Amino acid sequence: MEAAGGEQRELLIQRLRAAVHYTTGCLCQDVAEDKGVLFSKQTVAAISEITFRQCENFARDLEMFARHAKRSTITSEDVKLLARRSNSLLKYITQKSDELASSNMEQKEKKKKKSSAAKGRKTEENETPVTESEDSNMA
């Protein structure tokens, strides 16, 4: 049973490597067209291998940051910690994180308004309407 799981894992890793290699090739083609330079197949392969290994390191670091904080979920704070050595990347990630946080707050507020409006309608529906005869007794 473990052998099948290991084979499945290796298959997924190979697919991921292929996807990274393909994406690297596409990016190299774009740069080649833009800058008028050529990339050999060996160069593309080397860049994709370095990229894949760096992604593995990032994944391990993110897992360790979360584990150190006694969490099982990686948060945006972990990603910011990972990007701390690159000021421009950290600035970009912080900006996007703030945008996501404000967007999430807006969505929560909309949900609250919708639910409170729905509750208000339900209480209005539950109240019995006052008829004129009952109203005249009050006077």
UniProtKB/Swiss-Prot annotation:
InterPro entries: CENP-S/Mhf1 (IPR029003), Histone-fold (IPR009072). GO terms for molecular function: chromatin binding; DNA binding; protein heterodimerization activity. CDD domains: HFD_CENP-S. It is found in: Nucleus; Chromosome, Centromere; Chromosome, Centromere, Kinetochore. The gene is CENPS. Keywords: Cell cycle, Cell division, Centromere, Chromosome, DNA damage, DNA repair, DNA-binding, Kinetochore, Mitosis, Nucleus. PANTHER family: CENTROMERE PROTEIN S, CORTISTATIN. The keyword Nucleus applies. This is Centromere protein S. Heterodimer with CENPX, sometimes called MHF; this interaction stabilizes both partners. MHF heterodimers can assemble to form tetrameric structures. MHF also coassemble with CENPT-CENPW heterodimers at centromeres to form the tetrameric CENP-T-W-S-X complex. Forms a discrete complex with FANCM and CENPX, called FANCM-MHF; this interaction, probably mediated by direct binding between CENPS and FANCM, leads to synergistic activation of double-stranded DNA binding and strongly stimulates FANCM-mediated DNA remodeling.
